Structures are given as C-alpha cells and as structure tokens.
C-alpha cells in the first residue's frame, strides 16, 4: 500500500480539462481527460503524467469519467491480468449490480466472453440485462451452481469474478 509522506493532497482518479501539455504528449489545452496518479486528484489543478491520462469518452460527465477508473481498472486487472480472459470463455460475475461487477460484465462482453451476471438483488436483473447484455442473469442465492451448469451445458465457468466474497464465492 502506498503511504505518502504528509503533507499531500489525496485523490487517485480525476477528470478535467487539460490546461497545459507537452507537445509530444498527444494532448492539447482544452482536451477533456480522465486519469489518475497516486495522489493529487482532489486538487483544483493537478499535474499528471501524460501516460496517466485518457480522453474522456463522449457522453460521460466528469463525475462518471472519474468513477470509471476504479471500477474498470479493477475489472480489467481481475479478468485479463490475473485470469487471462480470452474470447468465448464463460465468465461468472458475482455482484453484477454493483460498480465493479457491472464493469466486469461490460468488459468481459466487450472482449468476447460469454457472461453470466449474478446478483443478489432481484429488482436489478432487468436493468443489468438491458444495459449490459450478458448471456444470462441469475440470482446469487441458494444453490445457483445448477443454474450455471444448465446455462453452460455442463461446462460451468472458466473464470469466476467475485468482488463480493463470502459464501457466494465458496459456492462458486
């Protein structure tokens, strides 16, 4: 864990407008960006290396863009860097109605995986289906292993992504 020496300004993820940029950075003043650094994101003006920035996707507010970093980088790290996700693998995502879970469903689908989204909140099943188009949405309660086996024709899952933990993970 990174522990900066005081005094320092907190904050990891940010979104904003480029005020100044090195000509070789690929950014120009006025560009809207998202990014982060180990500290300083809560400052009114932050100095961030160009490698820590990306363009703010169109249609997103600054708040949405800044929030993407934690959820999507966590999902990417788990799915790709730790589990080696490849297209056509079956991925079971627990906590699919939360921020990191939704990012994992979205990312895995974008990378060509077959995704089963599991949520403990029945009221959120339709929203997950409409917004993120997983291959299936199940309730993560009781013994859901049989549901997964039925959906995957007995294959079960190549990757279980679980930002929740506890009994649900043990069942997986």
Can you name each region flagged by the protein language model?
Residues 1-40:
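Glycine-rich beta-strand-centered segment in the early N-terminal region that forms part
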Residues 3, 32-95, 131:
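NAD(P)H dinucleotide-binding glycine-rich loop of Rossmann-like/cofactor-binding domains
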Residues 21, 95-96, 164:
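NAD(P)H cofactor-binding loop motif with strongest signal on the N-terminal glycine-rich segment
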Residues 28-29, 86, 155:
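Residue-level recognition of short, solvent-exposed, well-ordered loop/turn junctions
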Residues 46, 75, 108, 128, ...:
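Terminal peptide-recognition signature
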Residues 116, 136-172:
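Glycine-rich cofactor phosphate-binding loops and adjacent beta1-alpha1 units
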């Amino acid at each position: 864990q990174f522990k900066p020496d005081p005094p320092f300004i907190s904050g990891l993820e940010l979104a904003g407008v480029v005020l100044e940029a090195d000509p070789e950075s690929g950014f120009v003043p006025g560009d809207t960006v998202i990014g982060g650094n180990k500290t300083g994101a809560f400052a009114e003006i932050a100095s961030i290396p160009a490698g820590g920035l990306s363009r703010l996707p169109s249609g997103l507010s600054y708040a949405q863009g800044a929030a993407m970093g934690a959820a999507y980088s966590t999902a990417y790290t788990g799915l790709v860097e730790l589990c080696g996700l490849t297209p056509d693998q079956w991925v079971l995502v627990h906590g699919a109605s939360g921020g990191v879970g939704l990012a994992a469903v979205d990312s895995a689908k974008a990378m060509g995986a077959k995704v089963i989204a599991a949520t403990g909140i029945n009221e959120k099943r339709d929203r997950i289906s409409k917004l993120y188009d997983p291959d299936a949405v199940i309730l993560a309660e009781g013994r859901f292993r049989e549901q997964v086996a039925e959906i995957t024709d007995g294959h079960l899952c190549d990757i279980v992504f679980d930002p929740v933990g506890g009994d649900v993970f043990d069942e997986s």
